[in-house]
Amino acid sequence: MDADANSNNDEPNEDADSETVVRRDRFSGGPAREFLSSLTGDSRIFAADLAVDRAHVVMLAEQGIIGDDVAGEILAALDAIDSAGHSDLPDGEDVHEAIESAVIDRVGPDGGKMHTARSRNDEVATCIRYRLREDLLEAAETTLALRESLLEAAAEHTETVMAGYTHLQPAQPTTVGHYLASYAAAVGRDTARLLDAYDRTNASPLGGAAFAGTPFDIDRERTAELLGFDRVVDNAMDAASARDFLAEATAGLAIHATTLSGLAEDIVVFANKGYVDLSDDYSSTSSIMPQKKNPDT
């Protein structure tokens, strides 16, 4: 929506094909709008946007900014949109505009009140953080499961002697348990990094509006509570503009991928040396040399 989050309660416009659109400008139709639209890629934050919309509407009603009857109609429309799915949304510049258009289609002009006291700036930032929290927790859970498996295997091989390598050459004797525990330690640090990123992601930007807040008597702590955030992002400009949490999450995942790459490469080397026998489920063969077992996976 426009940066002015407080002036969108007018009746929606109709385009040349009588399709409800939230706003009209030089990008309202044609190839420019199609090129600029992120609606398809926004499917990843469809559920997040609906959650943010619901929390915002509930807060607006609790604060007396919109009526309970209007809030109920909007929430019912959001439920219907949720059931219909992302693929049923009308065309839009992004999922946020498309959902608002769909609400207005169902509710009428009052549906636009859903966006009262809110900018697309803080809305988008909140949706991204909401979805990223799920992704980070899922990634952290996989690291915990991997670390547990490594430690269980290490405990079974505390006295299983193996050659330790440097420069791909046998260097010193060690044990399989010692080797596996080294990766368990690295994975543990990966988990900690992901959880640190989660902590900095888990703050609500909602209510920051375009970048300087809103004169409406909103309750930012209430929407943060409804969305499961630990706290709000204090500075409204930082709330709308910050994206460092994305870089931090990406870095944590990249470091974990490096840990996994090292473990996978070790297994490839051990397979070549005949120390381990990879399952056929994780191997391929050659089109001309069927005796080969290639560790491609």
Language-model-derived ranges and their functions:
Residues D2-D4, D10-S182, G188-T191:
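A helix-coil-helix interface module used to build multimeric assemblies
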Residues A98-S101, D105-P109, K113, T175-T297:
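Internal glycine-rich alpha/beta core junctions
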